[in-house]
Amino acid sequence: MVVSLSFPEADPALSSPGAQQLHQDEAQVVVELTANDKPSLSWECPQGPGCGLQNTGNSCYLNAALQCLTHTPPLADYMLSQEYSQTCCSPEGCKMCAMEAHVTQSLLHSHSGDVMKPSQILTSAFHKHQQEDAHEFLMFTLETMHESCLQVHRQSEPTSEDSSPIHDIFGGLWRSQIKCLHCQGTSDTYDRFLDVPLDISSAQSVNQALWDTEKSEELRGENAYYCGRCRQKMPASKTLHIHSAPKVLLLVLKRFSAFMGNKLDRKVSYPEFLDLKPYLSQPTGGPLPYALYAVLVHEGATCHSGHYFSYVKARHGAWYKMDDTKVTSCDVTSVLNENAYVLFYVQQTDLKQVSIDMPEGRVHEVLDPEYQLKKSRRKKHKKKSPCTEDAGEPCKNREKRATKETSLGEGKVLQEKNHKKAGQKHENTKLVPQEQNHQKLGQKHRINEILPQEQNHQKAGQSLRNTEGELDLPADAIVIHLLRSTENWGRDAPDKENQPWHNADRLLTSQDPVNTGQLCRQEGRRRSKKGKNKNKQGQRLLLVC
């Protein structure tokens, strides 16, 4: 059974004439109902940016945050699947249903250049027609969406864990480790997070700020750690690492003070591609690459004044500046030169299947520090190739020219000529299949016992190196030995260590009793009432803010 979904058009009265050239194709959404009545998504991905958003009065902060969420690839995929609204029991006033409608209308009807008005369900509980902190609104929205998902899960499965699509996309785990400096005993505590706050007071780059987050902190004097093994307060060290990496990484540059709201307006560089592996508590396997897809920017002196806007990366790879109703194209250089407030990165574990592709050839070049070190050493000890001293043309061009000038027919004639000179005759007697294949390739067989390695080389046709001296080749011919295609290498056993969509509960099964914290904002007042925490066996509840 195939059901086509259609959605109402955006308000034409809010159309932006100048934005119509930025949008082209309207996506087509088709939900296929499987045998067990679970919808599987099959849709043509929207390529352009979403609609502009109307400023209803000091609402630029929420417009900028909503644009970043709308262009979050995993979240957009989930919203466009309409999976949540099909199971929601109370869609009226539901934040998840409201976000689903917002993302769907913005992305599926962006071809006409319409300007949307954000839903009051998303804004009314927070927006009071005055400037607010965009990061605070962002975390408030994610929290309320998470709570909406939990209500649906608890109604259908009362014993279900406190997980949701919001946790699956944005959620990660901190590991806080305290080590007693006397007995060397350690105590680990794990806390959930939706964003990573970075202290930029002394950092020149995001990478440096991430390293500063993991610096060891000494606990002495009044802050000494009570060691269960020593049975008294002892000096200790405390370190904080990311234990479980999220699918979408939100890096919040702490530009505003907690009390006065004054802004730290300094330049902090950030990369287009980020490797999170060095900052993990257990950095195993290959690189863990992330790609930048959105940047939230603030212009002004305090968080309660000035102006907010954002940059987003569309599915086809182009960048756009989303400034309320204005949607303008830009380049990545402009994006990387901004004084960013919140950075949005999406995990790129599977480079060929993600929404925003990172160039495969640049993975090691951009992300792996060890590769950079080896590369610099090779440059120092690399000898000058005699091929480059040829006054004719570079060796790569000569190889291409030689390859192009030798056709398949000429190669067959040359092969037959070489066979005759080598004195090889084809017999009509019954041959072993392996010998038939070897003769077709023009290879000689040794009568004595052949090693397994040599058998493999002959099967691959690599014994040509032994017959180069017998071939009658032109004087200017170049023999190129090509390996078999490596296109399918690694497909049978892909890297499973850096898979996205980490399950926090699965990571904690082999650990000691764990402290799970509530979802909190970096700073600012709480706008919503959290559900009652269940004191599960072996856990103590910890409020992490």
Swiss-Prot record:
Where is composition skewed (Basic and acidic residues) in this entry? 393-404, 489-505
One Pfam match: UCH
Q: Which region ranges are annotated with the description Disordered?
A: 368-442, 489-539
Induction remarks: Rapidly up-regulated in response to the cytokine IL2.
Recorded hits in PROSITE patterns, A to Z, give: USP_1, USP_2, USP_3
For this UniProt record, give its keywords in alphabetical order, as a comma-separated list: Endoplasmic reticulum, Hydrolase, Nucleus, Protease, Thiol protease, Ubl conjugation pathway
A single cellular component GO annotation: endoplasmic reticulum
Q: Which reaction does it catalyse?
A: Thiol-dependent hydrolysis of ester, thioester, amide, peptide and isopeptide bonds formed by the C-terminal Gly of ubiquitin (a 76-residue protein attached to proteins as an intracellular targeting signal)
Spans of biased composition, class Polar residues?
508-519
Citing just one GO molecular function, the answer is: cysteine-type deubiquitinase activity
Functional description taken from the UniProt entry: Deubiquitinating enzyme that removes conjugated ubiquitin from specific proteins to regulate different cellular processes. Important for preimplantation stage embryonic development.
Question: What name goes with this protein?
Answer: Ubiquitin carboxyl-terminal hydrolase 17-like protein C
Originating organism: Mus musculus (Mouse)
